[in-house]
Amino acid sequence: GFMGATYWMVPDESRTELYSTKLAYFQLVLWTVMGLVTVTGYLFRYGTGNKLLEQPLPSKIVIVIVMLMFLYNIAMTIKKSGRFTTTEGVLMGGLGLAALLYLPALLEFENYTVAIFYRWWTIHLWVEGVWEMIQGGFLAYLLIRLSGADREVMEKWLYVIVGLVFIAGIIGTAHHYYWVGVPSYWLPIGGLFSALEPLALIGMAIYAYSAIRRSGLAHPNKLALHWTVGSAVFTLFGAGLLGLAHTFPSVNKWTHGTL
């Protein structure tokens, strides 16, 4: 999903055409075939058995190749245009880190406890780290286009997002650390910082909606505008409130701790 959205956003933001449409289609075909083969393999018990990262090694290698092709295509598009915005920078940072943080998934450990420890470096730092950077980039782009919000102000919010992601997201990984040999003080610290992650995205949406009311701007595509702001609201209730409900150590040991 975010690959397709990026292929739309970056050329529009850079005011140029995509570097290679053929490469994008080849990437899509390769990704689709890999997904179908991998899921079919699960039916025959062909997988690693590592929860959430069950893909066999050949599939993981294809995922890495697809991500590298994707990043190359996007980077060359930006280079061709000569225009590079903060919105694109945050998006590219998130996409690059998404590829980088998948590398721990390629490692294999005989000790399952060690495997659990490093698994969250991919799963948590994807979901509650770089994906929020990616979402922030998309959200800023849409709000600038749809609400008439000031680009400079919106991009300042992106810096806040990056800061919260690196502080709250990275430290928040600790709320997964049950029975893996780390000191117990990491559990409440991880739970606290995990609850801070959606705040910047909500603030950005509130600012944009306030800007609409102040300026009286009525964008003709009201559905897209409300869907965009609604995405941030869902982030508040999903990643924020529901996420907070199970980051408390007494709850999380039954949700994540037993994985």
Residue locations for each model-derived region?
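Anaerobic metallocofactor- and corrinoid-dependent redox/one-carbon enzyme cores
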Residues: 220, 249-257
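Hydrophobic cores of alpha-helical transmembrane segments in multi-pass integral membrane proteins
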Residues: 1-13, 21-45, 57-76, 89-108, ...
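Short, flexible helix-adjacent loops and helix caps
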Residues: 11-14, 80, 179, 214-217
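Juxtamembrane/interface segments at transmembrane-helix termini
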Residues: 78-84, 110, 210-216
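Non-cytosolic membrane-interface motifs at loop->transmembrane helix junctions
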Residues: 49-59, 85-86, 114-125, 182-194, ...
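Solvent-exposed interhelical
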Residues: 18-19, 151
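Hydrophobic, small-residue-rich membrane helices and short re-entrant helix-turn-helix hairpins
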Residues: 83, 115-119, 124, 147-158, ...
